[in-house]
């Protein structure tokens, strides 16, 4: 596939590095190279993004990975791999940043669960806004939180999808919630997606954990 058309909007290199490494863990070097080829990311074959927070991993490159996973493994298989890559990106790259790093402190650990979510989710959104060109907001409702990505890298440039496709973002959120809550799993459903024609990508997070 021809190289992706760059957007000029970026994630930190480190996010791209961890995502690519997490895929290599699951599918091996040859499988990863096939995905990078298919996604137009040949420049990363044997040449991973540097391990730094410089903004250098283009939104279109992240979207290209998602498209390639679906094309090679089908919607269901691609979804599972993308969720895993998203979870790995949080657990390896993000949990030690800023306010999230304090989630292991005793003062935070003893807070009630809903207080942890009220503090942790906006902190997570703020980190994305600080480290990348992704802008996210959080709104609290009675039984759920609404996480909105206003410039979504995961489905950048995609149209005509028949259902939401931002599984990497869903995985990131699932792992962030697990970390912030001290080990609980939460239901995260993408309810709106730019790839299906919506103006934004929106994720509904149930307040009550499923485990």
Tell where the protein language model's regions lie, with residue ranges.
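Short terminal or interdomain "cap/linker" segment that borders an active site or interface and mediates
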Residues: 2-18, 129-170, 178-211
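N-terminal low-complexity or simple alpha-helical regulatory segments
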Residues: 2-84, 89-92
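Amphipathic interaction/junction segments at domain boundaries or subunit interfaces
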Residues: 54-165, 178, 192
């Amino acid at each position: 596939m021809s190289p992706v058309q760059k957007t000029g909007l970026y994630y930190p290199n480190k996010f791209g590095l961890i995502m690519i490494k997490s895929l290599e863990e699951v599918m091996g070097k040859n499988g990863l190279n096939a995905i990078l080829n298919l996604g137009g990311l040949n420049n990363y074959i044997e040449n991973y993004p540097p391990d730094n927070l410089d903004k250098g991993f283009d939104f279109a490159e992240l979207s290209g990975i998602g498209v390639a996973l679906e094309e090679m493994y089908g919607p269901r298989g691609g979804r599972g791999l993308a969720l895993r890559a998203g979870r790995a990106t949080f657990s390896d790259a993000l949990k030690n940043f800023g306010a999230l790093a304090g989630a292991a402190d005793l003062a935070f650990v003893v807070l009630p669960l809903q207080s942890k979510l009220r503090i942790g989710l906006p902190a997570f959104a703020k980190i994305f806004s600080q480290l990348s060109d992704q802008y996210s907001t959080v709104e609290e409702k009675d039984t759920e939180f609404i996480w909105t990505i206003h410039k979504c890298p995961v489905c950048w440039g995609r149209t005509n999808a028949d259902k939401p496709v931002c599984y990497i973002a869903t995985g990131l959120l699932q792992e962030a919630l697990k970390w912030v809550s001290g080990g609980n799993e939460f239901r995260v459903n993408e309810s709106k997606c730019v790839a299906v024609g919506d103006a934004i990508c929106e994720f509904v997070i149930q307040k009550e954990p499923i485990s």
